[in-house]
């Protein structure tokens, strides 16, 4: 095969120029779109090679020659490559258009939500309860929308961030003062004023006062409905058939709130921070079966009616009830990791029967009637300087490590041993603790002392309450009862 120099030279020159065009496009001609450069270069190259290459190699264009077939093949190849590039460009354009449309849709959806959010927040300040309630339902729905919207907001963290903003607004509404709440106790009973006694027979003043009472009573009831609707919506989303709910990972700040209505968080899961610092519950507060897996702050809270935390699992995080005030409190079967009840005050019943503590601080707490029967203290049990004005029942309570009753005051004899039918329920103290970990030196002013006796285990002597059992926490149940001497 012989090479014709002229067509070969022209072909090489065109090819070099085409390659240089591509290089200049890459480094310099940024304003010219790649698609048009590639199309132009390939069209020129394809045509040049189809026309010149057969000539350069002196292909036979006769009837039986291969020149025409080679040229046709090069033309088809060039056309195919150009077609593929064109299809790729169309796909790119369609993808960009789709991405743009998706972004426009996302912006539209988010803008529409934020517009609804702004309107709903404004509705919360309306003087009409129905409008405020509508704002609440809108905000609740928006939180659910954000959490479920994986399409426009793929990041779960971002969805929760948007939801937390709305949760903060709902909590802020709960925290906001309502003037009539201070008169709730008066407005909750029927109108009792007398025409003659209170108004000297002035019927106009009597009727005006009665109408004002009815108006305020209705306004109080409406506001209760709005706020209880918020609490109900939160509670329903804090649980899912025993599992955490869709709203369990949000922080809740109810600090210094006046709950002038019954509060129900039964079986709720709080998997983030929950703040009830300084709150006042004027009606019953129900937290039975609730779970707090992060920090739960009830410090300086005031429970003026019944506080039910029975079966609550206040674990993983710390639980702070320091300086809280209770009338009647039920913590039976509750579980705590680190519970701080220091300086708490229990005006009437305090039921901690069968409760479980890893660390418990009741220092300087005040009890009227305290039931710690069958409670378990795995680590610290600090009752130093606590005051018990009535029953203090520790029968069948179990202390595994550290028990401190130093400086405590008992107005009645503390119970560490109690007969229950044919059974004698005795407190248990672990022999694995150091003898000095048990301190029963109550206050010198205490009318009743904790009577102690010496017991020995494997040659180590302990002083524990009289009638109590010294047991080995690593041994069998029979050893627990039979190893005191």
Language model segments and positions:
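Membrane-anchoring/interfacial helices and their immediately flanking loops
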Residues: 1-25
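Extended N-terminal export/anchoring regions of large proteins
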Residues: 16-17, 55-58, 213-216
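Membrane-helix interface "capping/anchor" motifs
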Residues: 24-35
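Membrane-embedded hydrophobic alpha-helical segments
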Residues: 33-111, 115, 122
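N-terminal leader/targeting and pre-domain segments
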Residues: 104-106, 111, 115-122, 127-133, ...
């Amino acid at each position: 095969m012989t090479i014709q120099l002229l067509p070969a030279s022209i072909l090489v020159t065109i090819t070099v120029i085409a390659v240089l065009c591509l290089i200049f496009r890459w480094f310099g001609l940024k304003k010219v779109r790649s698609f048009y450069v590639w199309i132009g270069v390939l069209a020129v190259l394809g045509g040049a090679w189809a026309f010149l290459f057969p000539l350069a190699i002196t292909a036979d264009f006769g009837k039986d020659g291969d020149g025409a077939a080679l040229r046709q093949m090069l033309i088809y190849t060039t056309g195919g490559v150009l077609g593929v590039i064109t299809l790729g460009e169309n796909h790119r354009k369609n993808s960009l258009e789709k991405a743009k449309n998706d972004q426009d849709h996302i912006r539209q959806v988010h803008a529409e939500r934020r517009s609804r959010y702004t309107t709903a927040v404004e509705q919360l300040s309306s003087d009409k309860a129905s409008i405020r309630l509508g704002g609440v339902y809108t905000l609740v729905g928006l939180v659910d929308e954000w959490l479920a919207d994986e399409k426009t907001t793929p990041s779960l963290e971002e969805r929760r961030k948007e939801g937390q903003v709305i949760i903060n607004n709902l909590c802020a509404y709960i925290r906001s003062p309502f003037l009539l709440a201070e008169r709730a106790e008066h407005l909750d009973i029927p109108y009792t004023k007398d025409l003659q006694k209170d108004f000297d027979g002035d019927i106009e003043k009597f009727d005006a006062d009665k109408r004002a009472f009815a108006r305020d009573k209705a306004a109080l009831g409406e506001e209760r409905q709005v706020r209880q609707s918020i609490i109900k919506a939160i509670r329903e989303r804090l649980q899912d058939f025993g599992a955490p709910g869709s709203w369990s990972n949000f922080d809740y700040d109810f600090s210094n709130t006046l709950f002038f209505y019954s509060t129900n968080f039964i079986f709720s899961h709080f998997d983030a921070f929950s703040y009830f610092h300084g709150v006042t519950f004027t009606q019953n507060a129900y937290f039975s079966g609730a779970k707090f897996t992060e920090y739960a702050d009830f410090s300086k809270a005031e429970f003026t009616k019944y506080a039910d935390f029975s079966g609550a699992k206040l674990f993983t995080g710390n639980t702070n009830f320091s300086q809280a005030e209770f009338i009647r409190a039920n913590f039976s079967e509750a579980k705590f990791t680190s519970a701080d009840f220091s300086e708490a005050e229990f005006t009437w019943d305090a039921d901690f029967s069968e409760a479980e503590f890893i660390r418990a601080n009741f220092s300087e707490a005040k009890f009227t009637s305290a039931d710690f029967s069958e409670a378990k203290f795995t680590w610290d049990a600090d009752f130093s300087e606590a005051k018990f004005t009535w029953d203090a029942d520790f029968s069948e309570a179990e202390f595994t490590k550290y028990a401190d009753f130093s400086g405590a005051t008992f107005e009645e004899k503390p119970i560490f041993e109690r007969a229950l039918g044919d059974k004698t329920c005795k407190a248990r103290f672990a022999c694995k603790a150091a003898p000095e970990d048990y301190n029963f030196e109550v206050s010198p002013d205490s009318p009743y002392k904790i009577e102690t006796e010496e017991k020995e285990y494997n040659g180590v002597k302990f002083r524990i309450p009289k009638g109590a059992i010294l047991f080995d926490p690593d041994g069998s149940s029979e050893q627990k009862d039979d190893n005191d001497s």
